[in-house]
Swiss-Prot record:
Belongs to the resistance-nodulation-cell division (RND) (TC 2.A.6) family. MmpL subfamily. This is Acyltrehalose exporter MmpL10. It comes from Mycobacterium tuberculosis (strain ATCC 25618 / H37Rv). It comes from the Bacteria. One of its GO terms (cellular component) is plasma membrane.
Length: 1002
């Protein structure tokens, strides 16, 4: 068996990669993939076509003398080099490619810039670590010899420092554990060989367990964390030593009773083997139950520790007995004298004599310490795990000197909708949502497409737009006031035009009457002398002369009047040519044509020819010869007829119709002129009234723009045409996804992003944003958040859920195994209760030491791990103590308690000291979480060892008596070997127990 273990411990580690290498290959995810913050990060990355990497490195560039042009040249060079490193850099936020980021990435004092970089690989993976080292080298090489100082920090730097610290601390922790175990084992056994036996089993167990965990990680993909590696070493050292102490102590006890060494090994295995098996089962099953936790820190640590416990158990029941069998015949592991037996016997005697006092005193102390646990404030800031001298810690300190911590750790509010949000209504609803979020106490700024600078766009505020309209209305009102004289003149001119058109109508009527007479006369001439008729056919000269003379008089009278009335013709024609009323009225249009012909007749001399004809006719007298008159008249008539044809008077009927049309047109023109004048007057009056109204509206809108400029009063409106502008598209690129379905807002708070207040604020922001959804275009949108406070919120929520699971699984497993081991119900209940109060006392003491005296909050992961270890290890001691009580119960209640305390006090104390020493080795770590965990688990084991198992449980067992074993009767089923041991007790011991019993009765 020894050879098998040696071969296993040597060969197995050579067959698989080291556990440290597997920790790099399969790092622990902080949160499960379905965590809200993780889902939000992936959703935002997919929507904006970004890397979605949470592996962020922040480069801080400072120049305490002030950043200048030379510094910006170095910055430019660094950005170019990082962009060329596509293997390590997947994202870069700089203000060279995105100028609006200059304000965000630069400090207010003008002395520092930050450069966020997304590294390749998942956080904590070897790829991420190599990317970190390459980028760090580029940064240092670029700023070397310049006025800039570079610091690297951020999550990627913190994880890298934690990895380096874990590797650096592992050797010192294991060395410290080994030294303390050697010292304690030497004090306990005072035998070098016996002292080395637990170390041999621990060494073989540790090498085998680490190889097995690495193999499971290699084959099954089990994630391995630095915490798991450190705790695996500590748990194997503690549990393996406990199991060895249990077995060796019982072996020594049988040897003292005279058993042969080999027989003593057999009987020790039969006696304590079930306790070791029950203890290992309790711890192992509890650790396996942690596999169902959501947080990686629990779900990955649990299986690794369960493997370690299983290997330790197998080594304790196979390797250690084999070594004892080989070493015992030679006397190498012979027991030394029992120095502490008398002390523990007296301690048991005092307890059974005054069980209430001891129980009360122990409970008061435990409750007092446990009450301090209620003062605990948990830390979620991983930066505080590292010493201040680590590079990432130095970087954070330098960054906080120039930037607020919340400025460098942003949060994003993500709104995802099934439809495009790039609409006026969608943007207005988004602004309303952002406005509500910005009013939450503790929210310093909300940046987004509707508020790029943290405030609502002034140009998009409805009140601003109203003010602009008011200004323009005011200008229009002032223009109307200034043009009042022009309006009055317009009205006067319209009235004057109407009056003139009325006069024109009268003149046209008179002219038409004269022209009508002319037409009649000309028609008569045409009938009498036109056509095929000739003057040769006229046989009545006297009659002809008389008629000609009369016609001349008529023409003279009519055409003298017409000629005198044509002064108005030019103005009338000009008015008709520019009149829209005449354009729309056919009759007026016809009249206008006739007026044009009259104007033409006047201008080309046609009317003058008619007047000349009239005079010639009047001058016809009887003395003239008919031949002369006829010749002259013929020439004149031919000329007049040709001219009249140009006027359209060659057809008397058509001429009369046109004259009627002209008359009607003049009437319509005069009527329309009056209507226009009345309309102009009304328009002028209404325009003046409008000016008054515009002035009032302008005053109201300008007051709105000035007095209602606060965001809550301003309203929001983006005109559709703005959405197509290049400026809007440039701003929207950072906040709206290319398809327009996802919008994000950058949220900056006044709170420490690592505080519980910031975590609570996340829920408040989401609830407020969802409260702005009903009855808007965002009603069907999903709202989520991403960022470090959101991730910490999820960690806290999952932690609370996992703690409930861990507590339930641990308590149920411990109770069931204790019930199976003790075949009772009552004893397991108060034994588990004692373990729980021991755990709470350890947490309370940790709060006092770290939080009160050292000013450090407990890391959130410490209580969960401490609970599992303390309850499981406490169950080990419980099982050893309770099983011995049951086995010794044939002696009576008080005697069995004294006997049990005497026989197990030294064993439990030794085991407790050894386990506490192994946990105390964690105090040599440079990682704060490991130190806190080691201290709390260590002092918890000491409390359990020296108070709970030594005082509280024996006093409780004494008070309850046989009721502890209800419903069974263990005193009637005492183990045969234990009965033989009792029969071999010395007479002196029996006398002491009898005296104690008699004293108790009295």
């Amino acid at each position: 068996m020894v050879g098998c273990w040696v071969a296993l411990a040597l060969v197995l580690p050579m067959a698989v990669p080291s556990l440290a290498e597997m920790a790099q290959r399969h790092p622990v995810a902080v949160l499960p993939a379905d965590a809200p913050s993780s889902v939000a990060v992936r959703q935002m990355a997919e929507a904006f076509h970004e890397s979605g990497s949470e592996n962020i490195l922040v480069v801080l560039l400072t120049d305490e003398k002030g950043l200048g042009a030379a510094d910006e040249n170095v910055y430019h060079t660094l950005v170019d080099r990082l962009r060329n490193d596509a293997k390590d850099v997947v994202m870069l936020q700089d203000f060279l490619t995105t100028p609006p980021l200059r304000e965000v990435l630069g400090s207010k004092d003008g002395k520092a810039w930050i450069l966020p970089i997304g590294l390749a690989g998942d956080l904590g993976t070897p790829k991420s670590y190599h990317a970190y080292t390459d980028v760090e080298r580029i940064v240092k090489r670029t700023v070397a010899g310049t006025t800039l100082t570079a610091n690297v920090t951020g999550p990627a730097a913190t994880v890298a420092d934690l990895t380096d610290a874990g590797a650096r601390d592992r050797a010192s922790i294991e060395l410290a554990i080994a030294v303390m175990l050697l010292v304690i084992l030497m004090v306990i056994y005072r035998n070098p060989v016996t002292m080395l036996l637990p170390l041999v089993t621990i060494g073989a167990s540790l090498m085998t367990a680490q190889a097995l965990v690495a193999g499971v990680s290699l084959v099954g993909g089990l994630a391995v964390s630095n915490q798991a590696i450190v705790l695996l070493s500590a748990m194997i050292a503690g549990a393996g030593t406990d199991y060895a102490v249990f077995l060796i102590s019982r072996y020594h006890e049988y040897v003292r009773l005279g058993e042969h060494p080999e027989r003593a090994v057999q009987r020790a295995m039969m006696s304590v083997g079930k306790v070791i098996a029950a203890s290992a089962a309790t711890v192992g099953i509890t650790f396996l139950g942690m596999r169902f936790a959501k947080l990686g820190v629990f779900s990955t640590v649990g299986p690794a520790l369960a493997i370690g416990i299983a290997v330790s158990f197998l080594a304790a029941v196979t390797l250690l007995p084999a070594i004892l069998v080989l070493a015992s015949p030679r006397g190498w592991v012979a027991p030394r004298g029992e120095r502490m037996a008398t002390f523990w016997r007296r301690a048991g005697t005092r307890i059974v004599r005054r069980p209430k006092a001891y129980l009360g005193a122990s409970l008061i102390g435990l409750v007092a310490l446990a009450s301090c646990a209620s003062l605990a404030h948990f830390n979620y800031d991983d930066r505080k795990q590292l010493p201040p001298s680590d590079p990432s810690s130095v970087g954070y300190a330098a960054m906080e000197h120039h930037f607020s911590v919340n400025q460098t750790i942003p949060e994003y509010l993500i709104i995802h909708s099934a439809h495009d949000l790039r609409t006026p209504r969608g943007l207005a609803d988004l602004e309303q949502l952002a406005q509500r979020v910005s009013q939450i106490p503790g929210v310093a700024m909300v940046r987004g497409v509707t508020r790029p600078n943290g405030e609502t766009l002034e140009q998009a505020r409805a009140t601003y737009q109203a003010g602009q309209v008011g200004n323009r209305l005011g200008g229009a009102s002032r223009m109307i006031d200034e043009r009042t004289g022009d309006l009055n003149r317009l009205a006067s001119g319209a009235n004057l035009l109407a009056d003139n058109l009325g006069d024109v109508r009268g003149q046209v009527s008179r002219a038409v009457a004269g022209v009508r007479s002319l037409v009649d006369a000309l028609a008569y001439i045409q009938n009498q002398f036109g056509g095929n008729k000739t003057f040769n056919e006229i046989d009545n000269a006297a009659r002809l002369v008389s008629n000609i003379h009369a016609l001349g008089d008529a023409l003279q009278v009519n055409f003298d009047g017409i000629a005198n009335s044509f002064d108005w013709l030019d103005s009338v024609v000009a008015a008709l040519d520019t009149s829209p009323v005449c354009d729309s009225n056919p009759m007026c249009g016809n009249a206008r044509v006739q007026f044009h012909k009259l104007q033409t007749a006047r201008d080309n001399g046609t009317l003058d020819k008619v007047v000349g004809l009239a005079r010639q006719l009047q001058s016809t007298r009887s003395p003239q010869t008919v031949s002369a008159v006829v010749n002259d008249l013929g020439r004149s008539l031919n000329s007049v007829v040709r001219s009249l044809k140009s006027l359209g008077l060659d057809n008397p009927d058509a001429a009369r119709a046109r004259l009627i049309s002209m008359q009607n047109g003049a009437n319509d023109l005069a009527s329309a002129g009056r209507q226009v004048a009345d309309g102009v007057q009304m328009l002028v009056d209404q325009t003046k009234n409008m000016g008054i109204g515009l002035n009032q509206a302008s005053a109201f809108l300008m007051a709105m723009g000035n007095d209602a400029s606060q965001p809550s009063m301003a309203g929001f409106n983006v005109p559709p045409q703005v959405l197509k502008s290049e400026e809007f598209k440039k701003v929207a690129q950072a906040f709206i996804s290319p398809d327009g379905h996802t919008v994000r807002y950058f949220i900056q708070t006044d709170l420490n992003p690592f505080s519980t207040a910031a975590m609570d604020q996340v829920n408040t922001i989401i609830d407020t944003a969802k409260g702005a959804q009903p009855n808007t275009s965002l009603a069907d949108a999903s709202i989520s958040m991403s960022g470090y406070p959101v991730m910490l919120r999820d960690i806290r929520d999952y932690y609370e859920r996992d703690m409930r699971l861990i507590v339930a699984v641990t308590v149920v497993v411990v109770i069931l195994i204790l019930m199976a081991l003790l075949r009772a119900i009552v004893a397991p209940l108060y034994l588990v209760g004692s373990v729980v109060i021991s755990y709470m006392s350890a947490i309370g003491l940790g709060v006092v030491v770290f939080q009160v005296f050292l000013g450090q909050e407990l890391h959130w992961s410490v209580p969960g791990l401490a609970f599992v270890v303390l309850v499981a290890v406490g169950a080990d001691y419980n099982m050893l103590l309770a099983s011995r009580l049951r086995d010794e119960s044939a002696l009576g209640v008080r005697s069995s308690v004294i006997r049990t305390v005497r026989c197990t006090g030294g064993v439990i104390t030794a085991a407790g000291l050894i386990f506490a020493a192994s946990m105390s080795g964690l105090l040599f770590s440079s990682i704060g979480t490991v130190v806190q965990g080691g201290f709390i688990i260590g002092v918890g084991i000491l409390i359990d060892t020296f108070v709970v198992r030594t005082i509280t449980v024996p006093a409780m067992a004494t008070l309850l008596g046989r009721a502890s074993w209800w419903p069974g009767h263990p005193w009637q089923r005492c183990a045969p070997e234990e009965g033989q041991m009792s029969a071999r007790m010395s007479a002196r011991t029996k006398t002491v127990f009898q005296a104690v019993a008699d004293g108790s009765k009295r």
